[in-house]
């Protein structure tokens, strides 16, 4: 959408230019100043406008920036972002003063939002996976009373699909408050997408959620965060329980290896992988030395996992000597497994070719 006035267009052009400190006074006079720093515009790979400052260095989508400006009762930026094309109705999600609500009305906002609109705005806002945006989403939504008006089952479904690989998705429990559910949700998103600044923010603000962070790191194969939170000594979990959590999601080679290097039982890891029909994990466990083949085969038979039974019927599996050094440096683990293909899966592939 084009800016509604020549002045707004001029400001938009100015905000996209490379600037020096000599230009700061001009930017202040033009209202291109936010959080005691210059306000800049750029576009992401999807051609969406992003508002940036040195604090919001990853940028916010224009509608999200509007919500932040409304929360701060920053009239100048509310009007500017609206002229640049922001949907003023987004501001109704964060308005906290009546005179700011009146300004939003003057700029075209509705009297109130329907429950479906609240959920739609929530869905669109959370899609931008950066530290700046996830932290702001937490600030805007986790204690937002408007979210109590939405269809809670729909909200939980959104959360479920974003965190569906979490091993124990306890945040969807009916006994969990909306605020706690959303706080854990944003924390989980930060760990899943390796948003370092957001992870550190939640770690400092919510020390009581350290076990949740560990759970997320194991579930989402984030070996770097797993190493960091495990080494703090602020959360304890049995190593075999850690391995169990890592094995519930397939292809979690990084966190499975890390738990293996710490001494977790690799045969139990193989059993967990089979119970969850995670074939890639199963072969990786054999690469790491799991040798309870007959027990695993019996378990697969109990579950009627016929393909796994057939896989375990071959006898030529053996550990991969390349993997048994038990290193715990996450960088080295990541390098070692970056393009790893299971030795035993290759063996199975070869035997299948010969068999058929």
Curated annotation (Swiss-Prot):
A Pfam short name: ASFV_360
InterPro entries: ASFV_MGF360
Keywords: ANK repeat, Early protein
GO biological process entries: taxis
ANK repeat locations: 61-93
Task performed by this protein: Plays a role in virus cell tropism, and may be required for efficient virus replication in macrophages.
UniProt record similarity statement: Belongs to the asfivirus MGF 360 family.
Official protein name in the record: Protein MGF 360-19R
Organism ancestry: Viruses, Varidnaviria, Bamfordvirae, Nucleocytoviricota, Pokkesviricetes
